[in-house]
Every structure is written in structure tokens, then in C-alpha cells.
């Protein structure tokens, strides 16, 4: 599996141009992308990290990291996915960085999703949806999610970079992913959720034994 993730990471490097500021996601496939990016770090201006973990990895490779607030133009954002379909709709947030990932993805002009073939699905929903929640609202939000048909589980011992908690939600109805994304986000106490149906991936680079293909 690591070989496929490396393939996908290498394919994303082809989209990096000189003097770019690059948004960098979070997760195991992205970690391989950071390794590849380190080889051309002299060509890029800097990176915007979607998590403290990614920022630490970038700095360890000697890659400059800047704050999103200091960026007016972000040409590209590279990140993985827990699930992705052919339309570029995704479930993200297995690593708990979904809120910052969604923010950076929306700032970026182009979102490149890098995955191995196991992450490609016809219908989203087998992987649970991470929902970032203000701690005091955990029980209330969980009850509201049950009303939507979901089965929330508290992610024990995990605190997000924003100081919040995560509910992992199973068995949600993905017949209309965009409506689901909205339905979760309007619950008071919800910060963000891991359904990416509004900000789609512009390119989905899928690595398999036969090579890397763009799903879109």
C-alpha cells in the first residue's frame, strides 16, 4: 500500500510550479508528498499547513511554512481522502484535521486529491464522517445527529488543533451529500464535518499497480 501512496504523491509533484505557495493536507499519503516536495523545496516559495502535524513535518524537511492569513493567492492544495467518488466528492477527517483542511481547500484555486485505489468508491458512506464539535455541546450534537439517522461515537482522548472534540458518525444517508454536509453544519455546536461535497476535488490522482490515473 505504501508503494501506491508514493506513486500518488509523486504524481502530484508534476502540478507544482516555481515560486508557488502550496497548501498541504494531512495524512499518510500526504506525508509521502511532503517527502517528495522536500526534493524541490528550493523551487517553491512556501507551504500552508492544514494541521500542526503537517507543519512539523514540513519544517523538519526545511520547507518554509506560512500562515494562511498572510496568503492572498493559493494556487494549489494537495491532500488525501478517506473516501472519494468519481465526482470528486469526499469523506475526509480520519486524522481529525477536517476543519482546517476544508478551510485551506476552499482558499485554493485547485484541489488535488491523492489516493490509492482502495479509497475510490461508487457511493460514499462506509467510512464514518468525522464531526468537529465544541466540547460543551457534545451530548446535544450527538442527539441531533441520531435524529438525522446517524450513529455517533465519541473519539476518546482526541483533541483537534482547534481545541475541540470529534464525533465519528456511522450510517449517515449519502443520497444527497451536499444536503448532508449542510444538515450537519447547522447543528449548534458543530464546527465542521468531514463531508466534502461543496468543495470538490478538481483532480483525483488514483494510484494502482498499473500506474496513476486522474479520476476526473
Swiss-Prot record:
Disulfides per UniProt: none
Gene3D superfamilies the record matches: 3.30.70.260, 3.40.50.1360
Single GO MF annotation: ribose-5-phosphate isomerase activity
SUPFAM superfamilies named among the record's database cross-references: D-ribose-5-phosphate isomerase (RpiA), lid domain, NagB/RpiA/CoA transferase-like
Isomerase among keywords: yes
Reaction equation(s) it catalyzes: aldehydo-D-ribose 5-phosphate = D-ribulose 5-phosphate
Keywords: Isomerase
Catalytic-site annotation from UniProt: 101 (proton acceptor)
GO cellular component: cytosol
Biological pathway: Carbohydrate degradation; pentose phosphate pathway; D-ribose 5-phosphate from D-ribulose 5-phosphate (non-oxidative stage): step 1/1
GO biological process, one term: D-ribose metabolic process
Residues that, per the record, bind substrate: 26-29, 79-82, 92-95, 119
Enzyme class: isomerase
EC number: 5.3.1.6
Quaternary structure and interacting proteins, as annotated: Homodimer.
Family (UniProt): Belongs to the ribose 5-phosphate isomerase family.
PANTHER family xref list: RIBOSE-5-PHOSPHATE ISOMERASE
Function as written in the Swiss-Prot or TrEMBL entry: Catalyzes the reversible conversion of ribose-5-phosphate to ribulose 5-phosphate.
Name of the protein this chain belongs to: Ribose-5-phosphate isomerase A
Native organism taxonomy: Bacteria, Pseudomonadati, Pseudomonadota, Gammaproteobacteria, Legionellales
This protein's encoding gene: rpiA
